[in-house]
Amino acid sequence: MELWAFWIDGIRSLLHFLASDLGLGIGLGIFALTLATRSALLPLTWSIGYRGCIRQKKMTRLQPQLKRLKDEFGRDPKLYAEQLQQLYAQQGLSLLDARGLLALIAQTPILLGMYQVFRDGANAGRFLWIRDLAKPDLALALIVGLTTALLMAANPDLPQQMRLLLIALPAIVAVITALKLCSALAIYFAASNCFSAAQTYCLHALVARRVKSGALVI
């Protein structure tokens, strides 16, 4: 409990430094804090994201084989699972991507910490058109939805037949969620989405370039 209180105090102090001491204001302070924390996690999230990108491209390449297995063994769940596991093992894949979960877990303390800081009153003030950062804002919620859509669209390996749905649905959920949160936390999500979208785009571009040059075989 003392460790968590120390963590909360650290986030609060850093936000105060950015907003007051550097004169950024609470809105830009939240944006800067988000970019700083995401940058600090970049060595971890980049490594995990790189492996995840390769996994996605392998899964895309395996779609015809996966469909064939489902057609042949779909009526026998046990046999289908065995064949699926065998195919994954041949390709060096696991049924579950634990690394992606690790990246999410690494960011959870930051999200929960910022939520508590804002809940305790560190969200007082205004930013641009937003008069009260302690309350939700429709325009900001739409921006959160837009940045969520950009994040999803940055992944070229989304199934083409479901691409629009996989982009639109998370964006709609993000808008609804942001309308229930204080604007301060919505700024965090918008900034984090922008960072993640840029990282995703760069990762896929890097993998595609390495595959094209022959440095990486998938």
Report residues per predicted region.
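Helix-loop-helix
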Residues: 1-218
